[in-house]
């Protein structure tokens, strides 16, 4: 989620309710103090997917205090709030994800996470290394402002606080797919949904990619079974670690040597390797897990087949037994931004961050289960830059990497000053949408 090629500043006419804009301009400083305080608190107390108990309770209490109707315990810890405006209009959904990552924070911030937990059998730190704390705080701020200004709202606003975007614990369902399966769209019937994601592009920049915006994602797992033996006599066993090394080397040739990615980008990465308990024991078992990112279902099928062929070849050559699983923990479809919706609504992003709106022409190989929502109804998912002010602005190409760590890094940093644009973007989208699409 770090690489962008963005272009074409457009000039579009737009209107926002005069009262709503004046009230937002008047209230924004006090509101942002609250948003920042909420973010720092959530950042300091991160929770993994389907375990966002403290976070969801904080959200529930806040929404209820605003007089917003609340439904809780959706897909384990999800929260939905419904605000009815005083004017007739459509039901519009805004979404924020709540979960953190098994990452030990190294930012040195005064509100840095010190939380630890057990994940996949390992003691790990927990960190909001993907900025979901910012997403929650922004949407809490939007809910507060809109609730206080519901006399200017045309229609209903559905606030979706979603658990487990990063994936649920193994053996559990979760995330957007589970919220839909539990009927949130059937009950509340939104006709459009908007979401945002913070990332390390220049401060306050808002960027959107029409059409396929983010990749489909599948996790794979490869289990390797050998014959355990003493490390001093490897010939008396079958070494799964040697087979694992061959697998990793071969997996990295799929994209670089076996696939034409000129028109269809793809990624195959290895992210987890487990084997062994002692230095002098060749173990019986080893395991590899990784991720596959594609934009084309036929290409994804080809990659699955390539991985299976590689596994068969390595098993034959090493004497190990190898099994392959795909879609471990679920599958995320391509995140698709309805082009007509983007064209109709990008003016809202332009006025939320004047002079810093960019329309991208290159999709991102990150993945998002917001894609499940936008498969059901038209959706628009956009990016908010959270670098420190000035970082990256010296570059003519806003897509270049900066010296700010990217999402999922233990050094990932959200500059609080950028959250203002996120609040404004959501407010303007809600105000502008009725009658525009």
Which residues make up each language-model segment?
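Acidic/His- and Gly-rich active-site-bordering loop/insert found
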Residues: 20-127, 137-155
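Histidine/acidic-residue-rich, glycine-tolerant segments that coordinate divalent metal ions
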Residues: 116-127, 133-134, 145-146, 151-272, ...
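Short, flexible, mixed-charge acidic loops at enzyme active sites
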Residues: 105-116, 211-215, 393-405
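Sec-dependent signal peptide recognition
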Residues: 1-8
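N-terminal signal peptide c-region/cleavage motif recognized by signal peptidases
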Residues: 13-15
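Metal-dependent amide/peptide-bond hydrolase catalytic core
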Residues: 65, 245-437
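Divalent metal-coordination and catalytic microenvironments
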Residues: 42, 81, 94, 132, ...
């Amino acid at each position: 989620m770090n690489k962008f090629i963005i272009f074409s500043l457009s000039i579009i006419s737009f209107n926002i309710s005069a009262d709503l804009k004046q009230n937002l301009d008047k209230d924004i400083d006090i509101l942002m103090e609250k948003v920042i305080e909420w973010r720092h608190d959530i950042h300091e107390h991160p929770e993994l997917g389907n375990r966002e108990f403290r976070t969801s309770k904080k959200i529930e209490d806040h929404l209820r205090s605003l007089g917003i109707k609340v439904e809780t315990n959706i897909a384990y810890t999800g929260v939905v709030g419904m605000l009815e405006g005083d004017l007739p209009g459509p039901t519009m959904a805004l979404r924020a994800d709540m979960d953190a990552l098994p990452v030990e924070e190294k930012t040195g911030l005064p509100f840095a996470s010190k939380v630890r937990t057990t994940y996949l059998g390992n003691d790990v730190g927990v960190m909001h290394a993907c900025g979901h704390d910012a997403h929650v705080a922004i949407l809490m701020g939007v809910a507060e402002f809109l609730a206080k200004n519901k006399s200017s709202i045309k229609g209903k606003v559905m606030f979706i606080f979603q658990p487990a975007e990063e994936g649920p614990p193994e053996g559990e369902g979760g995330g957007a797919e589970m919220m839909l399966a539990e009927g949130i769209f059937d009950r509340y019937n939104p006709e459009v949904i908007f979401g945002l994601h913070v990332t390390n592009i220049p401060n306050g920049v808002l960027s959107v990619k029409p059409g396929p915006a983010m990749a489909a994602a599948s996790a794979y797992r490869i289990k390797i079974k050998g014959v355990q033996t003493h490390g001093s006599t490897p010939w008396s066993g079958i070494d799964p670690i040697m087979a694992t090394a061959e697998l990793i080397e071969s997996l990295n040739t799929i994209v670089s040597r076996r696939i034409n990615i000129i028109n269809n980008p793809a990624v195959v990465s290895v992210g987890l390797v487990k084997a062994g308990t002692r230095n002098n024991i060749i173990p019986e078992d080893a395991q590899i897990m990784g991720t596959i990112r594609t934009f084309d279902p036929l290409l994804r099928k080809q990659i699955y087949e390539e991985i299976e062929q590689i596994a068969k070849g390595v098993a034959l050559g090493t004497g190990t037994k190898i099994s392959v699983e795909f879609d471990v923990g679920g599958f995320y479809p391509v995140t698709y931004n309805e082009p007509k919706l983007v064209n109709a609504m990008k003016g809202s992003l332009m006025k939320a961050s004047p002079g810093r709106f960019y329309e991208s022409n290159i999709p991102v190989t990150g993945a998002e289960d917001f894609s499940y929502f936008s498969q059901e109804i038209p959706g628009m998912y956009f990016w908010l830059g959270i670098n420190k002010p000035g970082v990256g602005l010296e570059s003519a190409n806003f897509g270049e990497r900066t010296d700010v760590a990217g999402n999922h890094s233990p050094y990932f940093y959200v500059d609080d000053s950028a959250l203002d644009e996120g609040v404004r973007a959501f407010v303007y989208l809600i105000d502008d949408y009725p009658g525009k699409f």
